Swiss-Prot record:
Job description of the protein: Snake venom serine protease. Degrades concomitantly alpha- (FGA) and beta-chains of fibrinogen (FGB).
SMART domains hit by this protein: Tryp_SPc
The protein's name in its UniProt record: Alpha- and beta-fibrinogenase stejnefibrase-1
The EC number(s) this enzyme carries: 3.4.21.-
Glycan-linked positions: 103, 121-122, 154, 170
Keywords: Disulfide bond, Fibrinogenolytic toxin, Glycoprotein, Hemostasis impairing toxin, Hydrolase, Protease, Secreted, Serine protease, Signal, Toxin, Zymogen
Amino acid sequence: MELIRVLANLLILQLSYAQKSSELIIGGDECNIDEHRFLVALYKSGRFRCGGTLINQEWVLTAAHCDRRNMEIKLGMHSKNVPNEDEQRRVPKEKFFCDSNKNYTQWNKDIMLIRLNSPVNNSTHIAPLSLPSSPPIVGSVCRIMGWGTITSPNETYPDVPHCANINLFNYTVCHGAHAGLPATSRTLCAGVLEGGKDTCKGDSGGPLICNGQFQGIVSWGGHPCAQPREPGVYTKVFDHLDWIQNIIAGSTTATCPL
């Protein structure tokens, strides 16, 4: 994860919390190559930065704090070093944020919608993941995945994405666990209370899939990762459906939920 960059009056928190833009799955195993056709990798200057989710042939959803200039998006990737035959690469044509000022201290607005410079074609390793049709249910088992570090605080980055199952809690659990930062009703709280499984640095922007539905975007959490009673915080996709769908439809006045 990258250390949280906050305003001066929040600098004291930097040693305790971190964005997960460069995290990996802790406590997981290599994902099945067929289970993450929607998972994309965001690169900057040849360096892996974040994950993201393809939601149709032309749009990717990720975390706002993953934004970088001159970003490249790789689709259909499993191994970083051994390309799939159907891998495709794109760059952003447009980027959209809930907060036009890109104020990343507003953690409940950590969402970015990217329009690709050209549509992608479905293939063996590429296919979009649908937006959720119903809200998430506390108690659900959720799937996390990404190329983030698999160890913390020392970082070990894998060549292939790792996956793990975690549990969805009421957001108040994260509000209590991370009292210095606002886990709100616009966020989701997920992890394993005894620790040992978590998203981590490099996993930011990737999906949280609960009961088969795309419900969350990896946002931030404690450091080190996967500590007992410190679940991770995810942007709640369901609450942003109107904004997402209006942007895709071409609206210039779409607004995010308060």
